[in-house]
């Protein structure tokens, strides 16, 4: 664990201070695929013959190229083996994972505090819950009910097992929230048809590192939004994290090829210069952890689509901006140190750095050379920062 007074996270990556010409990048997206109505602020369906077919029931689903991709995603995550804490700590990207986990912890805690100002009982939908990596966050947030939904059946089974373990390890007087587990492709199936209580309403929907998969098509993106938002109470929140399309396109355009990355991650597009609003596919890999196709989320379109479900964007920050804002709060800074979300530099005598690659810690080395700076520092390697800084945080609120 890092020293209590360590200086936190000095960044010196080529992307940390780069200016993004968002107007020029936005104009690169192909708007011919869709139009928005000024009267309804909703996105009309134009693709795959969906103009007149609003029936999302399983009986209406066809086996298409899109659905085959969803099956690939489910199969991929079903094959990922569960590993213990000791094994995860050997990962090259352990500090980046911890950093992302800290960021989610801060986001979830702040939103639950807002909700609890209005309601004593809190119900949450974890949309794309995976293996249940946020279960302890919900327990710490003292919620009352959690619904977990994911496309991968094996992930849902592991999530349920984790939940049972949390309950079993808890103190007899320590009440744990009730939970419901649903296996579903949330970009194609309506959760309201699968809930034990079809009238259940949520105070929060959390969608972490998931929503971009739904931007394969307009109908999928819309169904995912519907699942996230239609059962939210007025004043409820839809929160999440997703890749920043502006940042991805900027780095791609700066690259000499159709790909970019470093020793921990890579992103590969089929070509440059054309970025359709839906189905803009790229291949993403992260230290062997994830290697499935993903899709750009053009955020202005995301915001416009959300209006259909009476949602208003109230917060949007890149991970860099979120960190710089939230670490100013002492309790968040303490949490970051407790979660070991930054790597100690220089390491102690028995430790070693996560990477021996050239230039990975030059930014920390320069900072540590300043006599006015207290050592040790807390940092991420250059490669980890470049990987995590492609993401952003968003919060939508349900209007009355």
Curated annotation (Swiss-Prot):
Catalyzed reactions per annotation: a 5'-end (5'-triphosphoguanosine)-ribonucleoside in mRNA + S-adenosyl-L-methionine = a 5'-end (N(7)-methyl 5'-triphosphoguanosine)-ribonucleoside in mRNA + S-adenosyl-L-homocysteine
Database matches in Pfam families: mRNA_G-N7_MeTrfase
EC number(s) on file: 2.1.1.56
Entry keyword Secreted: no
Leader sequence residues: none
Residues engaged in binding mRNA: 100-101
Biological process (GO), any one: 7-methylguanosine mRNA capping
PROSITE patterns referenced in this protein's UniProt entry, alphabetically: RNA_CAP0_MT
Localization (cell): Nucleus
Positions annotated to bind S-adenosyl-L-methionine: 104, 128, 150, 185, 208, 213
Transmembrane segments: none
Feature: compositional bias, Basic and acidic residues: 56-68, 360-370
Record's compositionally biased regions (Low complexity): 25-42
MF-aspect GO terms: mRNA 5'-cap (guanine-N7-)-methyltransferase activity; RNA binding
Region of interest (Disordered), residue spans: 20-68, 347-370
CC annotations in GO: mRNA cap methyltransferase RNMT:RAMAC complex; nucleus
Cross-referenced PANTHER family: MRNA CAP GUANINE-N7 METHYLTRANSFERASE, MRNA GUANINE-7- METHYLTRANSFERASE
Stated family: Belongs to the class I-like SAM-binding methyltransferase superfamily. mRNA cap 0 methyltransferase family.
Entry protein name: mRNA cap guanine-N(7) methyltransferase
Source species: Danio rerio (Zebrafish)
Taxonomic lineage of the native organism: Eukaryota, Metazoa, Chordata, Craniata, Vertebrata
Chain's gene name: rnmt
